[in-house]
Amino acid sequence: MVVVLRPWSLDDAAALFVASRSNPDLATQFPDVGLDDEEQARAHIRGALRFDERAKNWAIVEDGVAVGNVGLSAIEFLHATAWAHYWLAADARGRGLATRALTSVSTWAFDAGLFRLELGHRSNNPASCRVAATAGFRAEGVERQKLRYGSERFDVETHARLATDPVPDLPGFEVRTTS
């Protein structure tokens, strides 16, 4: 298994389309987005999965196929902070890919000059909580009823990792900034 992290390419549209359909829980990762075909997947890559000054999204590529995303958004250097996020296709879960990807991108972010990375997950998502904790993100609190999907509201547990926090003892992935 060869895994690299690299910016999304329009060539990843088919993989994104397949991943988006792999598990119903991924619908929350694509709010207000129609991913009904590869053209819509390409539009999503061009827009939401961009790689620029304020947002950096890396495809988690396993053996040449994009199986997930790890990213930073709301990047700002005045306070040296960013918001981290991740998702995996259903068949890529349970093997530590998200944890190692998040750890690798966190190292990249701290090397780039950021100091604090934050993330949040629904409190009913223990797998995402394990990813965050194993990647060195400490729980900081619960934001009550923060998210709404359909008619249901969800609490969000917030985590953060500082550049001064201990580095998790995990093998990293290669982090590329060009496709």
Where are the language model's segments positioned?
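Acyl-donor (CoA/ACP) binding surface of acyl/acetyltransferases
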Residues: M1-A15, A19-P24, A59-S179
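Generic alpha-helical scaffold signal
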Residues: L10, L35-E39, R54, L78
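A short helix-loop-beta-strand connector motif used in the catalytic cores of GNAT acetyltransferases and
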Residues: R46-A59
